[in-house]
Regions:
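Conserved SAM-binding loop
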Residues: 92-93
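A short acidic, Gly/Pro-enriched loop at the edge of an enzyme's catalytic core
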Residues: 142-157
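Conserved class I S-adenosyl-L-methionine
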Residues: 52-65, 78-83
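Acidic carboxylate diad motif detector
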Residues: 192-194
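A short glycine-rich, Lys/Arg-flanked "PGG" loop and its adjoining helix->strand segment in the class I
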Residues: 150-151, 171-186
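S-adenosyl-L-methionine
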Residues: 97-146
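Short catalytic micro-motifs in class I SAM-dependent methyltransferases
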Residues: 139, 158-165
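Class I SAM-dependent methyltransferase Rossmann-like catalytic core
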Residues: 1-54, 67
Length: 200
């Protein structure tokens, strides 16, 4: 995911639902396939291999997206979702608590069931919800590490697109990457999806 279209991600007037519907659910088919279809297929292959599993996973992905958690919920007892913006946390919790105004992720459930070869879409969504142990705000992320009181050590850190969005320079990218993995256990796994224009 290119970072330039999302340069206003951290602005105060950021619209969480509009962001999702533009890039992840109601946009052009080619964009949806790049941002949703491709990661889901890759994550299915990774998690179904059985090599990435454990007690806890930390997700630090862009926006209030949920599709990356479907395959992960098969392999981890607890999943922690971390965000920087109140708007995204509020919108994510609408889906989590089945509230009115939440993004309709039915197409993700259907795609996941097709990939996994299963039929019960409702059961899968409930499995994801039950595995989410916390939705946590990372306060002042630019200047502070992840709060060790809020997030335990985890077996896997999963991040889709976020580093590309918040890192304006190579140095910022390296600093943010260290922060993202600060709660990762020794021997744990990092699953990272980046934009094509990220300078490494």
């Amino acid at each position: 995911m290119a970072s330039s279209p999302h340069k206003h991600y951290l602005d105060e007037d950021f619209d969480a639902k509009e962001f999702i519907e533009t890039y992840f659910s109601h946009g052009k088919i080619s964009i949806i396939e790049e941002h949703v279809g491709f990661p889901m297929k890759v994550l299915h292959e990774v998690f179904s291999s059985g090599k990435v599993r454990g007690d806890a996973l930390l997700d630090i992905s862009v926006g209030a997206i949920i599709y990356q958690l479907f395959s992960a919920s098969n392999n981890f007892k607890k999943m922690y979702v971390m965000e920087f913006k109140d708007a995204n946390i509020t919108h994510f919790k609408k889906w989590l608590q089945k509230e009115e105004g939440a993004t309709d992720w039915s197409f993700v459930s259907e795609k996941f069931c097709h990939i996994e070869g299963i039929r019960d879409k409702l059961q899968e969504k409930d499995q994801v919800r039950k595995a989410i142990a916390g939705v946590i705000k990372w306060e002042n992320f630019e200047n502070t590490p992840i709060d060790t009181q809020l997030v335990p050590e985890v077996d896997c850190v999963l991040s889709l697109w976020m580093l590309a969005v918040i890192s304006k320079t190579k140095e910022a990218f390296q600093t943010n990457l260290k922060k993202f993995t600060s709660r990762l256990k020794i021997g744990g796994r990092l699953l990272l999806f980046l934009g094509m224009n990220v300078l490494l």
